[in-house]
Curated annotation (Swiss-Prot):
Assembly notes: Homodimer.
Protein name from the UniProt record: 1-deoxy-D-xylulose-5-phosphate synthase
Known role: Catalyzes the acyloin condensation reaction between C atoms 2 and 3 of pyruvate and glyceraldehyde 3-phosphate to yield 1-deoxy-D-xylulose-5-phosphate (DXP).
GO cellular component: cytosol
Pfam families given in the database record: DXP_synthase_N (PF13292), Transket_pyr (PF02779), Transketolase_C (PF02780)
Organism: Crocosphaera subtropica (strain ATCC 51142 / BH68)
């Protein structure tokens, strides 16, 4: 059977192992061709091809529900659930998403972008099923590091307390998240993977007993008891912890052996109650380069399939904000042993792998455990260390209470470095960094800043390290800087709560924040072509806002525009509007940012165009609003 003919996963039923292996081969080919052409997550999906096929071969997916953790594992799932012919549109505007979305397919039972959610969601569905008196299977597939997340462990704790609730948890154990897994749980699972000799010995004994003359076959039932005894003997090294938590444990099994997978899943479906199936896989399976470099090939930009090398862009790009941050922090840390970099399983993405390589004692990776990362940093700060929490904006959401309760209420000097702030592009709504300004600026004691470019980022890293009066956060975007000259060392801090004027004009005041400062300058140049002169301010800080600079300018010029790459509701523009009203300055103000809607996956420039946030669009709206039409009301 051709993969292209499969429109429903139930079509896998009745296929021979040889046919299923051929489907697996076709999935890998399509997966590799698509990611090589357009980019995306490569290694995770390649590792679960056989797991997906075997599981779906044992389920009735018109009834049964499968919940995937960390949706980038689910590319094979997408191909087997009617999206093969659209798979080439993966992560592109108006194409299929790189993660799971309930609105995209009836087979996507729960949306997933962040990690460690599948067991909680699956247990909720299983309890709902039982409450309604229905009868279908619920399977939660967790892996790619997600079992290191606290929520997953909370869900296991709850599920194990419900012996009559049928729920299957499948662990895709590839020893990785994005970087290698860390922590005691990971170390324990690695021991489990290494316990195969016990399984080999018991299987070998059974085979030898079968060949004994006269009564070999009759000993098979006894052999089963011997095998069970051996399993119990080995339990301290295998599934003892899982079984003590109330689950029936199966595994570890070879995640690339279809026959073994199908047999185990069939047994597990019959077990009843909470069941845990431990599947050992290889991240990047089937593509040698990805198997050898599982971190580098976790996700890829477009690349040459033969060589594995990224396809070079037409013109060289400036270094990324993440790279500049990593260099600056590492340089400062070399002269200050109190600086400790903390990541939650995102060392490569945040650049902290550079700090780890040079100063391993000044680096901590807590795994997918954002809440722990923040409170750990609070403890470090209590003892005089300078903790730097490098974390994606979207993931800090997961530790909001810890930021408020453990850091800000105690006014501890923790430095939060929020990577991927703003519009992130192809990862879509689960990963957009649009909300941090709004959810952080309402917290007392917290200072919040954003650099206009990569050179100012270097200065703000120094500012954050030097700021010992309380917590401070810096937000910065994904991708390349704007191309300004950089210093290797000797950076001067910026003054807390002070912005700067970059351009003077008497007709309209443009106040930009972070990435939108350079765009404000572009808008000013376009307006100049229409005879409109703008003052441009780089705010630098949303909290404390430089009211000594902004309020008099607004009062004098009389027309105010704010520009931010974040949500308008509660964002930077709201802060400026509040400040003007607090100072009894009532002037027309227009806020540009992201409205109250989700931003889907697309290239950042495509998303900005859809949102009316390109420089020509902003300039035209300003011209129409302030200079070609009657004056608007005070606040929009």
């Amino acid at each position: 059977m051709n993969l292209s003919d499969i429109t429903h996963p139930n079509q896998l039923h009745g296929l021979s192992n040889r046919q299923l292996e051929d489907i697996a081969r076709q999935i890998r080919e399509k997966h590799l061709q698509t990611i090589a052409a357009s980019g995306g997550h490569l290694g995770p999906g390649l590792g679960v091809v056989e797991l997906t096929i075997a599981l779906y071969q044992t389920l009735d997916l018109d009834r049964d529900k499968v919940i995937w953790d960390v949706g980038h594992q689910a590319y094979p799932h997408k191909m087997l659930t009617g999206r093969y012919h659209r798979f080439h549109t993966l992560r592109q505007k108006d194409g299929i998403a790189g993660y799971l979305k309930r609105c995209e397919s009836n087979f996507d039972h729960f949306g997933a972008g962040h990690a460690s959610t599948s067991i909680s969601a699956g247990l909720g569905m299983a309890l709902a099923r039982d409450a309604k008196g229905e009868d279908y299977k619920v399977v939660s597939i967790i892996g790619d590091g997600a079992l290191t997340g606290g929520m997953a462990l909370e869900a296991i704790n709850h599920a194990g307390h419900l012996p009559h609730t049928n729920l299957m948890v499948v662990l895709n154990d590839n020893e990785m998240s994005i970087s290698p897994n860390v922590g005691a749980i990971s170390r324990y699972l690695n021991k489990v993977r290494l316990s195969d000799p016990v399984q080999f010995l018991s299987d070998n004994l059974e085979e030898q007993f079968k060949h004994l003359p006269f009564f070999g076959e009759s000993l098979t039932p006894e052999m089963e008891r011997v095998k069970e005894g051996m399993k119990r003997l080995a339990m301290p090294k295998v599934g003892a912890v899982i079984e003590e938590l109330g689950f029936k444990y199966f595994g570890p099994i070879d995640g690339h052996n279809l026959e073994e997978l199908i047999s185990t899943f069939k047994q597990a479906h019959k077990a009843g109650g909470p069941v845990f199936v431990h599947v050992a896989t290889v991240k990047g399976k089937g593509y040698e380069l990805a198997e050898k470099d599982q971190v580098g090939y976790h996700a890829q930009s477009p690349f040459n399939l033969a060589t594995g090398k990224a396809i070079p862009s037409n013109k060289p790009k400036p270094p990324s904000y993440s790279k500049v941050f990593a260099h600056t922090l590492t340089t400062l840390a070399q002269n200050d042993p109190k600086i400790i970099g903390i990541t939650a399983a995102m060392a490569t993405g945040t650049g902290l792998d550079k700090l780890h390589a040079k100063l391993p004692k000044q680096y901590i990776d807590v795994g997918i455990a954002e809440q722990h990362a923040v409170t750990l940093s609070a403890g470090l700060a209590c003892e005089g260390m300078r903790p730097v929490v490098a974390i994606y904006s979207t993931f800090l959401q997961r530790a909001y209470d810890q930021v408020l309760h453990d850091v800000c209420i105690q006014n501890l000097p923790v430095f939060f470095c929020l990577d991927r702030a703003g519009i992130v592009g192809a990862d879509g709504p689960t990963h957009q960094g649009l909300y941090d300004i709004a959810y952080l600026r309402c917290i007392p004691n917290l200072t919040i800043m954003a650099p206009k470019d990569e050179a100012e980022l270097q200065r703000m890293v120094v500012t954050g390290i030097n700021h010992t009066d309380g917590p401070i956060a810096m937000r910065y975007p994904r991708g390349s800087g704007v191309g300004v000259p950089l210093m290797e060392e000797g950076w001067e801090p910026v003054s807390i709560g002070k912005g700067e004027i970059l351009r003077n004009g008497d007709d309209v005041l443009l106040v930009g924040y972070g990435t939108m400062v350079h765009q404000s300058l572009q808008v000013a140049e376009i307006l100049k072509e229409h005879g409109i002169e703008a003052t441009v301010v780089n705010a630098r800080f949303v909290k404390p806002l430089d009211t000594e600079l902004i309020v008099p300018l607004a009062q004098r010029i009389g027309k105010v525009v704010t520009l931010e790459e974040g949500c308008l509701m509660g964002g930077f523009g709201s802060a400026v509007a509040e400040a003007l009203l607090d100072h009894d300055v009532v002037v027309p103000i227009k806020r540009f940012g992201v409205p109250d809607k989700l931003v889907d996956h697309a290239k950042p420039d495509e998303s900005k165009a859809d949102l009316g946030l390109t420089s020509p669009q902003i300039a035209e709206e300003i011209r129409q609003l302030f200079f070609n039409t009657p004056q608007p009301s005070a606040v929009s």
